[in-house]
């Protein structure tokens, strides 16, 4: 009879899978000389409350070790055909998804080519709660004496305890040939049935290759009959299938389980029986020396001391409703492996072929479906500790870097190089000292450092203190202190009590590391030149000079200072008085000439500046100035004859006429243009020459030039005035 396997939705003969798996496995020949050693080399013993059989599937891409699972010849005749029928109809295993073309859970044994072995195959069922015959198990028994020597017998049931220990003894073969270790099928997106299983693999010596086998354990009640043993196990299997199946989440990383280096007659893997009321808490006890779990995606390589077994993504230790405690007691160096994979195992690097990661044995937890999952508290604690340490390290490095940068800078202090300089007036020394002491050095240094910082932020090349750096402070002279809050003395922008203290540091520090600071106190209202104004001359001025001339001089005084340097640059400021574009030629110099006459008059006789001088000196100065003014005005008045002009010498026109005539723009131009310097005469020569007489030829040239250009301008101005008058009359009538 050809055994069948459930593949997809069809039943496929198992010979097809034999051919697939045999292509990926190595055929091994074992000498018959070592067959008699299996009684002296017990490998493992497992006891459990569960009565279910489960074998992890073998990987299709790995080396498959075929092993035979056969009952002993003593108990073989006791298995009835009815038991086989009941066992075939019992749904034991369940798988939801099967992506690989390999069969689910089956064992294969590699025998000699001349011998045939018993093949028992456990198949998956598609549905979990179905009661149909989902398991097809066929066994072809050919009793051969050589084959029976390789079969693993059952142990006798133990009547002293409440369970039957089924011991499977594996062979330990001494061979220098390469024997493939037992590997497991990889479960891809499958649900493992609720079974208690421990898959152990062992290797013997550095030159010994051992065959690993699965260890199954069933625990029925006390009985001497194997038939009743099998029937009770089938009933418990049906009850266990009614409970929800356990889910095994496959992880993305491959885990190689290192099998312990067993020596014959030294190790027994025991699991004592406990009360059913105990919790399901698997405890893994081992020596402090714990072997590592190398993580890699490559194939398991055979080492001198141990085998790397590549199981499915995890080797679960499942539990059913029956409560038990598994304890692995090891008296030697063993590998401490967790029961199930945690979710954090997918973070292991796939390139760590020779890398060893030490994984502790956490206390597993049971989820809702009853599956045992390893606790990931230790992993999360390690991850949290590593992240916390990294954050603390980065924070400390971040806090340390500004300190190192600040230490590179040379600490500097302030030092007043000289007494405070007062500009714009005179202030008592006591007030200046109080003002300087009211501002602390730390405040000045902080403000200068801020400016240095702003320069660095803008990317400027010179962050050091220099002449461009300065800090200004508002100072009240009445309070004699710096203003930190509003002061009652300061009202308005122009206040005589307000002053500004400027602190200007030197570019570099001296040898002592101190930066000298220059203090400058600038008054808001500097000393005005009110004494130079010609207001006292108003009373002593003759009638030939009109009052409107003085008003024009006052207006010019507001725009032009008294220094000679500013007088030289008056040509650049002549556009201020050019009212219309056609009047630029005429209005370039008159506004400055009025001021020059005034300066010349003051420089010729400085006694006229004082109002308390004698009347004779003032009258002589006024007569001399009036004569020069009259001579210049006669020339200019003769040259400027138009409808809009008026005679300066006429004293009958009071200031009322000036107010009415200044409303029109050309009239204002004529007020300022009655003084003219001849061509070729500089202003400085005119000012410093006391008895300067105008040459008759030079005014003629200017007169001829002015006569050529005047008619056009006069026509334009008359037309403009007429047009303005007509528009004014038009709007007035309406």
UniProtKB/Swiss-Prot annotation:
Subcellular location: Nucleus
The keyword Oxidoreductase appears for this protein: no
Transmembrane segments annotated in the record for this chain: none
The entry's keywords: Nucleus, Phosphoprotein
Gene Ontology cellular component list: nucleus
InterPro entries: CSNKA2IP
Keyword set includes Nucleus: yes
Post-translational modification: Phosphorylated by CK2 (casein kinase II), specifically by complexes containing catalytic subunit CSNK2A2.
Comp. bias (Low complexity): 612-654
Region annotation Disordered: where it falls in the sequence: 608-654
Subunit annotation: Interacts (via C-terminus) with CSNK2A2.
Function: May play a role in chromatin regulation of male germ cells.
PANTHER family registered for this protein in UniProt: CASEIN KINASE II SUBUNIT ALPHA PRIME-INTERACTING PROTEIN (PTHR35825), CASEIN KINASE II SUBUNIT ALPHA'-INTERACTING PROTEIN (PTHR35825:SF2)
Protein name, entry field: Casein kinase II subunit alpha'-interacting protein
Organism in which the protein naturally occurs: Homo sapiens (Human)
Gene: CSNK2A2IP
């Amino acid at each position: 009879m050809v055994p069948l396997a459930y593949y997809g939705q069809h039943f496929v003969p198992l010979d097809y899978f034999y051919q697939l798996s045999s292509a990926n496995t190595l055929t091994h020949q074992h000498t018959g000389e070592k067959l008699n050693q299996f009684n002296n080399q017990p490998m493992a013993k497992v006891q459990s409350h569960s009565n279910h059989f489960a074998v992890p599937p073998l990987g299709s891409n790995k080396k498959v070790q075929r092993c035979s699972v056969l009952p002993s010849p003593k108990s073989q005749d006791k298995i009835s055909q009815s038991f086989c029928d009941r066992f075939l109809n019992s749904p034991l295993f369940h798988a939801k998804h099967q992506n690989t073309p390999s069969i689910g859970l089956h064992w294969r044994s590699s025998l000699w080519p001349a011998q045939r072995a018993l093949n028992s195959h456990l198949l998956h069922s598609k549905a979990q709660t179905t009661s149909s015959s989902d398991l097809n198990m066929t066994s072809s028994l050919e009793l051969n004496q050589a084959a029976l020597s390789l079969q693993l017998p059952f142990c006798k049931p133990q009547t002293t305890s409440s369970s039957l220990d089924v011991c499977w003894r594996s062979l330990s073969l001494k061979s220098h040939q390469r024997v493939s270790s037992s590997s497991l099928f990889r479960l891809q997106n499958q649900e493992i049935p609720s079974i208690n299983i421990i898959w152990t693999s062992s290797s013997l010596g550095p030159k010994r290759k051992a065959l690993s086998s699965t260890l199954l354990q069933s625990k029925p009640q006390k009985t001497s009959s194997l038939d009743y043993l099998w029937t009770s196990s089938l009933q418990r299997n049906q009850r266990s299938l009614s409970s929800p199946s356990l889910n095994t989440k496959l992880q993305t990383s491959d885990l190689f389980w290192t099998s312990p280096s067993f020596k014959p007659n030294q190790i027994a893997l025991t699991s004592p029986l406990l009360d059913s009321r105990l919790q399901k808490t698997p405890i893994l006890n081992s020596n402090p020396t714990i072997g590592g779990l190398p993580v890699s995606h490559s194939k398991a390589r055979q080492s001198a001391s141990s085998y790397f077994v590549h199981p499915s993504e995890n080797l679960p230790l499942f539990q059913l409703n029956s409560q038990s405690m598994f304890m692995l007691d090891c008296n030697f160096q063993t590998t401490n492996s967790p029961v199930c994979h945690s979710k954090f195992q997918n973070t292991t690097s796939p390139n760590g072929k020779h890398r060893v990661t030490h994984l502790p044995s956490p206390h597993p937890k049971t989820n809702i479906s009853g599956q045992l999952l390893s606790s990931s508290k230790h992993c999360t604690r390690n991850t949290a500790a590593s992240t916390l340490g990294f954050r603390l390290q980065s924070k400390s490095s971040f806090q340390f870097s500004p300190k190192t940068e600040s230490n590179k800078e040379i600490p500097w202090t302030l030092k007043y190089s000289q007494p405070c300089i007062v500009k714009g007036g005179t202030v008592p020394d006591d007030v200046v000292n109080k003002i300087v002491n009211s501002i602390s050095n730390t405040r000045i240094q902080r403000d200068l450092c801020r400016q240095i910082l702003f320069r660095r932020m803008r990317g400027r090349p010179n962050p050091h203190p220099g002449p461009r750096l300065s800090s200004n402070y508002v100072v009240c002279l009445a309070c004699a202190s710096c203003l930190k809050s509003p002061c009652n003395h300061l009202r308005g922008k122009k206040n005589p009590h307000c002053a500004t203290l400027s602190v200007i540091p030197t570019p570099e520090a001296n040898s002592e590391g101190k930066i000298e600071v220059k203090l400058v106190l600038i008054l808001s209202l500097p000393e005005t030149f009110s004494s130079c104004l010609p207001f006292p001359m108003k009373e002593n001025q003759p009638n030939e000079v009109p009052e409107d001339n003085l008003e024009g001089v006052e207006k010019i005084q507001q725009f032009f200072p008294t220094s000679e340097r500013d007088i030289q640059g008056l040509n650049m400021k002549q556009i201020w008085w050019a009212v219309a574009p056609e009047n630029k030629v005429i209005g370039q110099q008159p506004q400055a000439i009025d001021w020059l006459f005034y300066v010349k008059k003051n420089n010729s006789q400085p006694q006229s500046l004082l109002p308390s001088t004698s009347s004779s000196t003032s009258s002589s100065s006024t007569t001399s100035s009036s004569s020069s003014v009259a001579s210049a005005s006669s020339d200019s008045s003769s040259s400027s004859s138009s409808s809009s002009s008026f005679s300066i010498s006429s004293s009958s026109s009071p200031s009322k006429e000036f107010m009415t005539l200044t409303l029109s723009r050309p009239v204002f131009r004529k007020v300022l243009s009655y003084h003219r310097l001849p061509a070729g005469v500089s202003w400085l020569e005119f000012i410093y020459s006391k008895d300067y007489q105008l040459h008759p030829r030079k005014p003629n040239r200017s007169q001829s030039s002015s006569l050529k250009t005047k008619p056009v301008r006069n026509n334009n101005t008359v037309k403009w005035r007429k047009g303005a008058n007509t528009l004014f009359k038009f709007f007035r009538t309406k």
